[in-house]
UniProtKB/Swiss-Prot annotation:
One of its GO terms (cellular component) is cytosol. This is Nucleotide-binding protein Shew_2893. Nucleotide-binding protein. It comes from Shewanella loihica (strain ATCC BAA-1088 / PV-4). PANTHER family: UPF0234 PROTEIN YAJQ (PTHR30476:SF0). SUPFAM superfamilies: YajQ-like. The keyword Nucleotide-binding applies.
């Protein structure tokens, strides 16, 4: 029986490349000349710091743009609500969602079961295993997962016939 896993992962190499490209763009942009701004990456967390809150928001847009160029879904970004002000700099933390938490997994399994396809979906830690009799059913599940608006991008791996 064909099976596959639904996961939510961020390619760390592409994420680091996007952060480096954002840093390069920051150095070359005219509106950031003479402004102390910094982009740093550590443990799936990007820290954007600049002299004003508005510039931090511009840096978030620059990072989103670079992520989409590197084929990393910007929907996996979790931007802090407010920039932290300390001294003369504002810092904004951006974390990236890894794995499917249990609430989202339950909603996705419910969507799959409500579709009346002949597949079984089982939650396995931070991924969902889907098995079915036909490959077409699994492809329909892939379409359902892509169309679902659960605030998280999904990838599909371990596709077995």
């Amino acid at each position: 029986m064909p099976s596959m896993d639904i996961v939510s992962e961020v390619n760390e190499v592409e994420l680091r490349n996007a952060v480096d490209n954002t840093r390069r763009e920051l150095d070359s942009r005219f509106d950031f000349r003479g402004v102390e701004s910094e982009v740093s990456y550590k443990d799936h967390q990007v820290t954007l710091s600049s002299e004003s809150d508005f510039q931090c928001q511009q840096m978030v847009d620059m990072l989103r743009n670079q992520l989409s160029k590197r084929n990393v879904d910007p929907a996996s970004m979790d931007v802090a609500e407010k920039a932290i002000h300390s001294g003369k700099t504002f810092s904004l933390k951006v974390t990236f969602k890894e794995g499917i938490d249990s609430l989202v997994a339950k909603k996705l399994v419910k969507l799959i079961k409500d579709s009346k396809l002949k597949v079984q979906a089982a939650i396995q830690g931070d991924s969902i295993r889907v098995t079915g009799k036909k490959r077409d059913d699994l492809q329909a599940v892939m379409a359902i997962a892509r169309e679902s608006d659960l605030g998280q991008p999904f990838q599909f791996n371990n596709f077995r016939d």
